[in-house]
């Protein structure tokens, strides 16, 4: 058995290979940023065997190849390399070209998210924000994504429309 995030599971179903990334491990709180390794202290505290952690691959690197079963079911070419995976907010920041300290991605959908990149290992001691290894984080170059999530942003837009803009009146 291995601990897998959704992207790890999808890649495993495509390739048959089980692996993960530092970014993925950090989203699962399994990464020790100060020592640049799996958070053994957390694994030990909860009694998790370290063998549950999958092999770690770079975020941008070959992480497997599409196998015959997946290729046949999905109409993909067998052997196509799987070369990237990350969580939703790191992916959003990537799509908006947010890579460097001080750069911010902000989106509003079901939730409202502000995601900024930091170049230092630090954290919020009150846990008001989440910190992940950003897609371009390496041991040599710290790039941490700091995420503030405001749940209910999308439903707020609906509430405003129903309660402030009567039927027949557009936002324009």
Briefly describe each language-model feature range.
Residues 32-34, 59-63:
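Short beta-strand to alpha-helix junction loop
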Residues 46-61:
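A conserved helix-loop-beta module that forms one wall/lid of the active-site cleft
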Residues 1-18, 24, 29-40, 44-47, ...:
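Active-site core segments that coordinate phosphate-bearing ligands/cofactors
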């Amino acid at each position: 058995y291995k601990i897998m995030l959704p992207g790890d599971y999808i890649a495993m179903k495509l390739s048959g290979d089980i692996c993960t990334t530092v970014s993925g491990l950090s989203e699962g709180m399994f990464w020790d940023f100060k020592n640049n390794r799996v958070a053994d202290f957390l694994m030990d505290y909860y009694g998790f065997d370290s063998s549950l952690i999958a092999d770690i691959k770079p975020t941008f690197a070959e992480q497997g190849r599409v196998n015959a079963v997946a290729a046949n079911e999905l109409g993909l070419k067998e052997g196509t390399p799987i070369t990237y995976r990350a969580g939703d907010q790191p992916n959003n920041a990537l799509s908006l070209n947010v890579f460097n300290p001080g750069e911010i991605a902000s989106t509003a959908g079901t939730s409202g998210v502000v995601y900024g990149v930091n170049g230092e290992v630090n954290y919020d001691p009150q846990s008001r924000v989440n910190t992940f290894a950003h897609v371009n984080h390496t041991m040599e170059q710290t790039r941490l994504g700091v995420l503030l999530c405001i749940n209910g942003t999308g439903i707020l837009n609906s509430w405003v429309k129903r309660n402030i803009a009567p039927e027949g009146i557009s936002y324009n």
